[in-house]
């Protein structure tokens, strides 16, 4: 599994040849990972859509599913992304896991569930249609500029939050579908 944590990689992607075109993160990822393994799978460009969250949890048991349905890391919170899976012919032994309890278990307030302006996270699901519809309105501009308000409300790893150009790029990509 290959991914990134926090916003630091954005300046690298933005300065790369892919940084000025459409889908810079996906194109940069494909270029950088090409040739590192016998094959590479990506979480974008499907179908087929591969079970990246399941693979990530197997590789790193400290990852847990947050109330928002995305993986939370005990140090980086919701501010990490899975970019690719490297496939090798030979079996590679993983280092011993460092399982830790999910930080969500001890979070009584669950601000992530209360902060979404359209209540898109409820009943154990995510109302993607309501979220995207809201983003297309003037009221949705704070989310488009600052990033997902529910993710920003999570106290875990807040210092690693995506900000500025990266947050805006990711929100535009999500809003487009």
Model-derived regions, located:
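Non-ligating segments of multi-cofactor redox enzymes
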Residues: 1-177
């Amino acid at each position: 599994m290959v991914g990134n944590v926090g916003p630091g990689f954005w300046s690298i992607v933005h300065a790369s040849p892919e940084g000025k075109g459409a889908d810079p993160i996906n194109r940069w990822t494909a270029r950088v990972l090409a040739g590192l393994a016998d094959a590479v799978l990506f979480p974008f460009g499907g179908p087929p859509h591969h079970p990246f969250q399941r693979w990530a949890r197997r590789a790193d048991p400290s990852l847990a599913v947050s109330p928002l349905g995305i993986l939370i890391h005990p140090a980086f919170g919701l501010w990490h992304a899975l970019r690719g899976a490297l496939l090798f012919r030979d079996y590679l032994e993983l280092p011993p896991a460092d399982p830790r309890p999910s930080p969500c278990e001890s979070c009584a307030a669950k601000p992530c569930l209360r902060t979404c302006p359209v209540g898109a996270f409820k009943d154990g699901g995510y109302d993607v249609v309501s979220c995207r519809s809201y983003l297309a309105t003037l009221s949705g501009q704070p989310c488009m500029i600052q990033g997902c308000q529910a993710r920003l409300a999570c106290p875990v790893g807040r210092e690693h939050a995506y900000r500025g150009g990266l947050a805006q790029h990711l929100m535009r990509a999500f809003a487009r579908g």
